[in-house]
Every structure is written in C-alpha cells, then in structure tokens.
From Swiss-Prot:
This is Uroplakin-1a. InterPro entries: Tetraspanin/Peripherin, Tetraspanin_animals, Tetraspanin_EC2_sf. One of its GO terms (biological process) is epithelial cell differentiation. It is a multi-pass membrane protein. Keywords: Disulfide bond, Glycoprotein, Membrane, Transmembrane, Transmembrane helix. Glycans are attached at residue 169. It comes from Mus musculus (Mouse). One of its GO terms (cellular component) is apical plasma membrane urothelial plaque. Residues 35-58, 112-229 are extracellular. Belongs to the tetraspanin (TM4SF) family. Coiled coil: none annotated. CDD domains: uroplakin_I_like_LEL (cd03156). Residues 1-13, 86-90, 252-257 are cytoplasmic. Homodimer; disulfide-linked. Interacts with uroplakin-2 (UPK2). Binds to uropathogenic E.coli fimH.
Length: 257
C-alpha cells in the first residue's frame, strides 16, 4: 500500500501541468502547421513552374515534410498528454524519442524551405533569365511558363520581371519569334478594358505609359514565394522553439519517476 502511494506521488503536479499545457499547445500548433502546408502544396499562387524550371522547388518539398510533421506533432503531443497524466517512465521515454524524430524532420523542413526561397527571391536576375529563355519558346516548359507569365501579367497588371524594358534590353525567345518593330514586348503588357480588349494597341506598342503596364511582376512573384516560405519556415521555427523547452521539461519529469 505504501509503495503504491509513493509511486502515485512521483512527479510534481506542477511539472505534469506544464507538460499537459505545453503539449496541448504543440498539438494545436501541429494542426495549424498541417493546414498551412496543405495550402502551400495546393500552390494557390500557381508559381510552381517558375521554381520547377530552376530546380529550386524544394520549398514544396519542405511543405510535404511539414505536412507529415504537423500531423505527427498532433499525434505525439496527444500521446504526451496521456503519458504525463499516467506518469509512466516508458511512456515518457517513448514520447521523447518520437518527438525527437519529428523535431529533426521539422528542422529539415524549415531549413530546406528557407534556403531555397532565398535563392529564388534574393535577386530578380534568375527569374528574368527564365522568362527570357522560356517565354514563347516552342517546348513543353516554354508553353507552361508562357501560360504562367500571361496569367500573371493580366491578373497583376505588370510586364516582365522588372518592367517592359526587360524585353528590349535583353535577347529572348520572344524576341526571336517577334521582331521589335512588330511588338517590343508581349501584347499582354498592354492595358485593357473590362472585356480584355487593349485600350490602345498602337499606344502600347510605342510605350505610352497610359496604355502599357510599367511595373514589373517580380514583386508579386516574390510575395507568393515569401508567403509559402514564411508559413513553412517561420511558423515551423516557432513550433520548434516552443517544443524544445517542453521536451526538456519531459526529460526532467522522466528523471523524477
């Protein structure tokens, strides 16, 4: 009887409370991470072709890892709540081992997404080179990127990466297909009416600012990639920073059982 009572009193109630609260926050954060990264993999901004052509699409690889980690955080943290309430050494040890595995995978997801994001948006020259190489090119990648750029230029009312002069200052697949005297930039750089009819095609051709989109599309593309990366990396890092002290408390709790 005395032995059973002593065993039942092992572990401070305060520590148990901290573990329960800490793991509840982790499991809720895991669900949020899961939802966030599902949104990323759905590619709502539809910029994956830009990243795929460069071979720097590991932002999406990080998102797939984070989907696994988000669900795993939910499951393991739920188990951690039960382990803390049951006060069983083997359950706490199992919790620590599982959480450590998930922690390592989430670190990989955060680092992978952030480093590849930095490569894509730190300098517009990479995206400019892709645009000039593939826009209007008669290849599968060229057709895919042409559709992507057409959609972005229409929806965001922009032209080129930095502006319409990208098409004039550099050689491109578009220039090889369309001489400058015919059209110095893609016709979709022209301002349009609500029915998508050019307001003044001749004015657009000569570069009149009232009839031509003058801003570049890089701001929109960078914002799209940043939105994906912040959701994966920085929210992931925040979860990791919270999870570490919870794991340390669990280690201490394990030594008291």
């Amino acid at each position: 009887m005395a032995s059973a009572a002593t065993e039942g009193e092992k572990g401070s109630p305060v520590v148990v409370g901290l573990l329960v609260v800490g793991n509840i926050i982790i499991l809720l954060s895991g669900l949020a991470l899961f939802a966030e990264t599902v949104w990323v993999t759905a590619d709502q901004y539809r910029v994956y072709p830009l990243m795929g052509v460069s071979g720097k699409d590991d932002v999406f690889a990080g998102a797939w890892i984070a989907i696994f980690c988000g669900f795993s955080f939910f499951v393991v943290a739920s188990f951690g709540v039960g382990a803390a309430l049951c006060r069983r050494r083997y359950m706490i040890l199992t919790y620590l081992l599982l959480m450590l595995i998930v922690y390592i995978f989430e670190c990989a997801s955060c680092i992978t997404s952030y480093t590849h994001r930095d490569y894509m948006v730190s300098n517009p020259s990479l995206i400019t080179k892709q645009m000039l190489t593939y826009y209007s090119a008669d290849t599968d990648q060229g057709q895919e990127l042409t559709r992507l750029w057409d959609r972005i230029m229409i929806e965001q009312e922009c032209c080129g990466t930095s502006g319409p002069m990208d098409w004039v200052n550099y050689t491109s697949a578009f220039r090889a297909a369309t001489p400058e005297v015919v059209f110095p930039w893609p016709p979709l750089c022209c301002r349009r009416t609500g029915n998508f009819i050019p307001i003044n095609e001749d004015g657009c051709r000569v570069g009149h600012m009232d009839y031509l989109f003058t801003k570049g599309c890089f701001e929109h593309i960078g914002h799209a990639i940043d939105s994906y990366t912040w959701g994966i990396s920085w929210f992931g890092f925040a979860i990791l920073m919270w999870t570490l002290p919870v794991m340390l408390i669990a280690m201490y709790f394990y030594t008291t059982l």
